[in-house]
């Protein structure tokens, strides 16, 4: 198997200039497990630090836009859209990040970055109510971050 980002000269960013622009979409998901009481506080808008979901959406969108700055071999991609949405369970929030672009390379790393930062932002916003009496986080856990869909298609 030939490595695409490493050769005898060292590490490189893969050349994509010869590739055709195509519609690209990627959807990534992940979950944060929280205490049921914390979920209730988020739903009621009673987290002291502010609007948890709005902060997570803004942070996730900004992260998508900056993916090429934090993952060294990612290309800067002209994005056409980003959506961050939430589904609630009794003791978790599932975050979905959908990223769209018309470009030469895919957007799955952007979707993964967006969902990861949105989840981290939720943790940051609720840490005061998630800590136990020793200042630890025995219930809080980020899990199941994955790409659930990747699309590449020609558009006329």
From Swiss-Prot:
Coiled coil segments of this chain: none
Recorded superkingdom: Archaea
Catalytic activity: (8S)-3',8-cyclo-7,8-dihydroguanosine 5'-triphosphate = cyclic pyranopterin phosphate + diphosphate
Amino acids binding substrate: 73-75, 109-110
The protein's enzyme class: lyase
Signal peptide positions (record): none
Keyword hit for Lyase: yes
Enzyme Commission code(s) on record: 4.6.1.17
Any one GO BP annotation for this protein: Mo-molybdopterin cofactor biosynthetic process
Gene Ontology molecular function: cyclic pyranopterin monophosphate synthase activity
Keyword line: Lyase, Molybdenum cofactor biosynthesis
Stored NCBIfam families: moaC, PRK09364.1, PRK12343.1
Family: Belongs to the MoaC family.
Protein name, entry field: Probable cyclic pyranopterin monophosphate synthase
């Amino acid at each position: 198997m030939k490595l695409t980002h490493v050769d005898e000269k060292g590490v490189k960013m893969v050349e994509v200039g010869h590739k055709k622009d195509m519609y690209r979409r990627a959807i990534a998901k992940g979950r944060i497990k929280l205490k049921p009481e914390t979920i209730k506080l988020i739903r009621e808008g009673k987290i002291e630090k502010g609007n948890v979901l709005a902060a997570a959406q803004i942070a996730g969108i900004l992260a998508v836009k900056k993916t090429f700055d934090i993952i060294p071999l990612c290309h800067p991609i002209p994005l056409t859209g980003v959506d961050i949405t939430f589904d609630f369970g009794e003791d978790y929030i599932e975050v979905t990040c959908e990223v769209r672009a018309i470009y030469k390379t895919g957007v799955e790393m952007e979707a993964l970055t967006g969902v990861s930062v949105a989840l981290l932002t939720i943790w940051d916003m609720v840490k005061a109510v998630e800590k136990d009496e020793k200042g630890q986080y025995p219930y809080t856990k980020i899990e199941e971050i994955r790409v659930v869909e990747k699309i590449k298609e020609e558009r006329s």
